[in-house]
Each structure stands twice: as C-alpha cells, then as structure tokens.
Amino acid sequence: MLWCPSVLVPLIAVAACLPVLAIGTPLEWEFAITLKSKILFVDEFWRTLASAAHEFDELSALTFDETEELIYFNDQQHRNGSIFSLRRDALMASHIAEQAIQRTGNESVGGLAYDPLNRNLFWSDTLQKKIFFASIDSKVTETPKVLVDLSQEGARPDGVAVDVCRRKLYWTNSNITHPTVESIDLAGTNRQVIIDTDIDMPRGIVVDQLSDRIFWIDDLKGVFFALKSARLDGSDRQLVLHDKHHEPLNLAVTNDAIYWTDKTTKAVWSHPKVPIVKATTTTSPLKAEEEDATETIPDIEPEPVAEVSALLRVANLSEEARGIVARTGFYQRLQKDEHCANIVRKVKERLDLMTKKKQMRSLVDEKTAQLERDHCLNGGTYIADRVLCICPTGFKGSRCEIRECHNFCVHGTCEISDRAYPKCYCQPGFSGERCEISKCSGLCLNGGHCKLEDISEKPSCECPHNFAGERCEQNSTEICALFCRLLKHEADIYVPFGCHDICEELAKDASDKIAIPQYHHLEVCMTPSPWTSNVIIVLVLGIVSCFFLVAVIVHGFRRLYKPKRPRIRKTFVVRKQARTNSSGDTPLTNRPLATEQCEITIENCCNMNICETPCFDPKLVEQTLAKSSNCKEDKKILIHNMDDDLY
C-alpha cells in the first residue's frame, strides 16, 4: 500500500517504505477510525495498534493534520466542547485530548475538514444547516464563523473536504429532494454547484490530491449505495462501485484504494480506485470515426466491466464505524506538483516559523529569556525575583519538567480536570484511580481462570478440579473430609453423594479418622443391572401369554380341519315273551306287549335306570331265547363288544 517515488529524499523514502515501522515512531499507524466511544488506530495490515479518547461517549466525524500529527474529532454529547484535538505520543504510548472548539448549542457535526496552511477547521452542522469554520490558534471561547448559510435554501450539508492545493472547500447536500455537490473558495467566494444530477443522497466526500479527483458516497434509494468520483470541476463522472446492504457514512482515499465505514455491518470496506462503470453518457465508436455522418446514433447505456469487483472487508469492529482518515503522505509526494508545490512550500515555511517563534525570545531582557529557555520548561513562567517557575496546567516540578499525565494512567487516557488534577478514563476491563486495577485481579482463587466475556457483565471464574464457587473458594476435598470425619462418630449423618470417592481416597492414609459413606444401591447406581424384578415379571408374563396364544391357535385349527365322527342312532326292542300269532313270527319281528318289552337307544344303554329291561347284545338275543338261561348267563352277554359291533 505504501508508494515510494524515486524523487523523494532518502530519509523520507526510508521512513515511508519500511514494511514494518520501528516501535514508537509517529508513523506507526496508517488509519484512524472513530467508533462510538473511542478512536481506533490500525496499521497498513489492519492490525489494531492502540485506542484513545475513551472518555467520550458519542464520537462521529474526524480529520487529520499530517503536518503536526494531530487528530481532530467531534463528540456529539460533550457538555462543554464540540471539537477536540488528539495528539498521540507514540514514544510514550499515551494520548492527550484537548478542547479545540467550544460548544455553542445543540449542533450536530456531519463532516469535518482541516486546512493546514491557515490552520482552520471547517465543519457542517446538519441541524443549523450551515458550514462553520474557526482557527485553532484562536481562543477556545471564540464563536465560530459561518462560511455558508444553507438554512434558507432547505439544504442539508453533510460531508466536507478541503482542496489544500486549489484553496477550495467541497461539500455534499444530502437533501433528497434536491441533492447536490458544491464547492466554494476558502475565502467564502465563488460558490458553485458542480453536480446536481444522477445523485440521490450524497454523504461523505474526500479530495484526492494524488489524482486531482473528488470521491463521494451516494446513499441510493432502497438498499443500494454507490461510490462515485469526478474531476474537481465535476466533469468526467465515474461510478466506482454499485452495491447494496450497506449504510456508508465517511470515506478515505489512499494511493490505490478507497476505504469507507459501514454502520450496518460494523466494518470497514475497501475497493480499488479504478472505476467499474463509467457514469457519463457514452457514444458509439462509429460516431467518432464518421465525422461527416448526418444521422446521430443514440446513446448507449454503460455496461459493467466483466471483471469481478474487488470489494474487500478489511476490518470487523465491535461498535458502529463512523469516521475514517488515512495517512497519505501527500506533503512529501506532491512537492513538485504544479498545483501543490507552492502550498507545500508555504506549509513548510509556516512550520519553520512556528519552530523559530518557540525558540525566539525578547532581546529586551536576555537574562530572563535565557532563564526561561534553560530553567522553566514546557511553557512555564519564570519569576525572576523569586527564582521559581509557575507551571501551566498539566505540569509540575521545580522547572515544570514533569507532565502530570506522564505514566499516570496505566490502562487509560489521561486528561487534566477542571481542578488541574490528572484524571484517568479507563479502558474496558480496568478500574481504579490510575486504571491500574483489572476486574480479574485477585478474583479467582485456587488456580481458577478469570473470564471477561462481556464488558458490561461481571467476570466469571473457571475452577479447577475439586473446587467450586463464584471465586473457586470452595474446596470439595476439604468439605468431604469434614463430612467423613463426622460420619466416623455419627453414623446417621448425611454425606453428599459426590464425597464417596474422595473419602475412599482419604481413608487409605487415615482409616481410623475417615469413614467411607455407604450409599444404598450404590453399586446399582454405578453399574445398573438390566435384570430387575419388574423386567423379569414382564418377561415371564410375555412367555406365558405366547404359549397360551399358540395353544388356542392349534386347538382352533384342529377344530376347523378335523371331521366330526358321525353319530349313528340305533334302536333295539327287547322282549321276554314273544307272541306266536303265526308260523312266521319271531321274537325280533313281533313287538312284545307293553308290560313285557322296552325300547331303548343303544347310546343310552349304559344308563340302566331308563327302563327296567336291561340291554342285550343283539347278536346273541336269538341264541338265548331258544335256550333256557339263567341270571348269570344274562350278565355275561350284557353289552358284550358293543363298540366293535355298532357299524
């Protein structure tokens, strides 16, 4: 990112071209960014180097004086001051913030710019709709002067930028009904509207002395935004980038890139200065070649270049990113520029003159001047008759050699209070009169690790093994040892469950003093068995149910598919005395008399009480009737082989 032309003197070239600057040099930072409550300094690789201005609450715009290494910034909520200066002492790694412009009302600074030649600050007030300026050499209480009054026009001045070489001020009018980009001489004359078409809501603006162009941010309608550039007179307008979902506020330009802050993503983005699309109207190449053509060819809409846009997110921030400035080194690079060489020479002459004024003293009293120069330091007033120094605010010592803020704040920014005492504004995570106390200091005991995840919350402790509590102050080993000692004497005392292993370990060395708690079902809790009584009961019931279901199914199939045995009913008539009505009558063909015979089915033969006549085997009836039989023989032939003779 650093550019080293061959025309530079060797000392400047070495200072600017070193890739890693020595620690403590004033040129160690490349970009400064205002967040809501601090100013962030980063190097060319966007590594955070330091932060400052922690005592302020609502920072917005800022500008940078490269000649004297001063940052000028605005605080929207400070009660006394509106614009402040910040001098960063890299050798001391400290920052000194001083009030530059007093607050006059409820002003709201939109943009801030600095003229190093006349040492004037210019800023836009979005509430009063005016552009003010004031000299930093004037008294703080002096009222700022109005350069441009836009209140009657309904305009809303936003970003401002100074063209040091051509002595002009540029500003953007973000009134969406009639947005413009305008310029005026630093003397307050020759006001011009250089751009008033094809813009929606221009915000931040910057003058690039290296390319003689202006760059500005245009907050387009909807979710879109654009980065645009033009020559200093408004011609040759170019569209550098057209994108969406950003809310850009301010921008800075280096030799090869543009950087801007975005409130939506809380980040800083960059893009090359090479334009992607030409915003001016283009014509057909044929029209340029055919100069004598009578027919005009309609304008062709610009088309984007086929290359992919090199949009890059260079920094992620913890708060809203607002203002941004970059170190350009244009005083060294533009010493031979036709427009800037004269201004650079005058600035150097002014710096030399300031140095000489600091060294010059009145020749009227050479002794007093010599004493002031040698004895009283840092602007102290020498009292000759008392031979002492009256030190200015912020210094002390017999020769005013001690800066009261020097090494006073360990982790913070020092500022001299209204009572002339140093006061520290601590960085997040620190407190104390000198910001020497860390919120984590001495908090965690017994080797605990302190964590501070959120600045607004209390720090917490991560405790090692066998320690607990907010500060890791509770030793579980000692607590369990007390319980187990009491258990040795009182068997019914309750011992926490987690103490079993600890007491078991302690009992190895002092078994006579330590008792090991015996918990019910400890083994079951430690190694639980799956075969519980409930599981066994459910398993047995399931098996029995399965067997019963199988039996029912088998029986059903047997009933369904096995044929029934036919039931055959036979009736036999038994009689004791047959009638001899004819020659063909036989005992089996003639029914006996009612008193002498009995009719019975063969199935009921076993039920002997149905009739008085017993059952006889049919095959033997005829044989027995022809013979004389007795009672014993009748019993022998009763139901003889009846099952075999039914069918």
From Swiss-Prot:
Belongs to the cueball family. Pfam families: Ldl_recept_b. It comes from Drosophila pseudoobscura pseudoobscura. Gene3D superfamilies: Laminin, TolB, C-terminal domain. Has a role in spermatogenesis and oogenesis. Disulfide bonds join 376-389, 391-400, 440-450, 444-461, 463-472. The keyword DNA-binding does not apply. This is Protein cueball. InterPro entries: 6-blade_b-propeller_TolB-like, Cueball_EGF_LRP_Nidogen, EGF-like_dom, LDLR_classB_rpt. The chain crosses the membrane at residues 535-555. GO terms for cellular component: plasma membrane. It is found in: Cell membrane. Residues 556-647 are cytoplasmic.
